[in-house]
Amino acid sequence: MNSAARERVFAALLKYWRGHRGMSQLDLSLAAEVSARHISFLETGRSNPSPEMVVVLAEALDIPMRDTNELLRAAGFASRYAEPSLDELLSGPLGMAVTTMFDHHEPFPMMVVDRLYNVVRTNQGGLRLFTIAGVDLGASGTIASEAGAIGPVNVLRLLFDPARRDMIGDWPQAASTMLRRLQREAFHRPHDAALAELLDDLINAPGVPADWRQPDPTVRDEPMLGIELRAGDISMNFLTTITEFNAPQNVTLAELRIESYFPTDDQTRELCTQLLG
């Protein structure tokens, strides 16, 4: 890509993000402490940014790190933030830290999920939970359907699976809460096609109310979600939390989450202990 083409791509991306965030050039100039005139010149290609300026603007626009790297490359610069593979990331100190967290949380479920809520790793308590839900979670983190197809285990797709909804007490509360979270994340990452596809699939799943399509900004979700799991004679009650890593220099790590389950009654606590053996 030649210099002129790069300038056009960067200018278009900058203007897109500013519009997506609902900011005027003056708003952005104040947030980034840059003159509105310079913002205008950058968006028309009359000025070229430095890599430092790209990062300043990205931070002012609250652009995710993965997209900030894209913005830097569009301006002709190298990526700023590392994007290691999951295997590479979890084969080092982080993997050992996750294992320690898993061990300390036993016998209660805990799992690591990626930005699309695919299960990356789980402790033994998590494996038992999936077994109760009728999910065959192998060591490779895949699930086999009745047709024999193989794919990642996705906790949101399981939650919205019509065949498993009866297993979730107060399914509308749990599902609507997670859908609002996904809608917020999709707004924050508008270029994430896989995330948009997941959101579209869930919104259009059978039995999902039409009014869930439009997120209600007045609804404030609690930091913890209560969930009841039912399977045959088994009933388990948990509070679930989602923890994110604070990783300002690593895209992959910043997109990982730890989903933890805490029992809310003695019956659930004892059953988790018995299942782990």
Stretches with model-predicted labels:
Residues 19, 30, 59:
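Alpha-helical residues within the helix-turn-helix
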Residues 32-48, 58:
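Recognition helix of helix-turn-helix/homeodomain-like DNA-binding domains
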Residues 1-21:
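A short, Lys/Arg-rich alpha-helix, primarily the initiator
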Residues 12, 22-23, 49-52:
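Residue-level signal for the short linker/turn that defines the boundary of a DNA-recognition helix
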Residues 90, 96-107, 113, 120-277:
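Hydrophobic protein-protein interaction segments
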Residues 52-55, 59-92:
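Short amphipathic recognition helices of helix-turn-helix/homeodomain-type DNA-binding modules
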